[in-house]
Amino acid sequence: MKYIYELESVKVHRLSLVDKFYMEWIKSLIDFYFYGQKEEAVARLEKILSQLSVPDLTYLQVSNTLFNFYYDIEDLESFNEIREKLEYQVNQLNLKTIEELNLSIKFNYNVCRYLWLQNNTEEAITKITDTIKQCKTYRTTYLLADLYLLMGNVSKNFSSKVAVKEYFETAYFLYKLEGNMSMALKIEHYIADITE
C-alpha cells in the first residue's frame, strides 16, 4: 500500500477532490500502521471528515477508520462518540451497492471485535449473530470467515468444545474457499488444540 501511495502521490495535483481525500485516507493508514505516527494520522482523518458531508460514503468509510484508530490509541471517549454516530449512519444505509453492504458488515464486525475485547460477551454474541445473519440475507461471504472465527473466540470460555469447534471449522472452510491459506492454517491449529 505504501509503495502504491508513493507512486500515486506524484499525480495528486491532477486528482479530483474525492480522489485527493482518498489519498489522504491512505496516507493516514500508512502513517498509523507503517510509521507509527498515530496522532498525525488521527488529526489527518479528523481534518478530512470536517471537509466531507455526513451521509457521503467516503465520510462513513473514513469515520470507520477513525473509529478503529481511536480504539487503538485508547481514546475511548472519542471512540464511543464516533461509534454512536456511525452506528446511526450505517443503519440508515440502503445497502443497494456492494460498497454500502461491505461498509455495514465491516463496521459491525469492528463493533463485534471491540465488544469482545471489552469482555462484553453477551452483546458481542448478539452483534456477531446479527452480522452473520446480514451476510446470509445478502448472500455475501465478506468477512463471514472472520465473524465465525470471532464467534469461536468469544464462546470458547463457556461454550461446549463441539460448538466452538463448529465455529472454527466454518471459518476454516470459508478461509479455504477464499484462498486465504494463512488464516486456514491458523484455524487448523485452533481446531487441533480443541480436539486434544
Positions of predicted regions on the chain:
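Flexible inter-repeat linkers and adjacent short helices
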Residues: M1-E40, Q51
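Structural register within alpha-helical repeat arrays
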Residues: K27-L29, L66, V111, L144, ...
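Residue at a conserved register position within TPR or TPR-like alpha-solenoid repeats
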Residues: D31-F32, Y70, N108, L115, ...
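Amphipathic alpha-helical segments of tetratricopeptide repeats
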Residues: I4-V12, L45-S53, E84-K96, T129-T140, ...
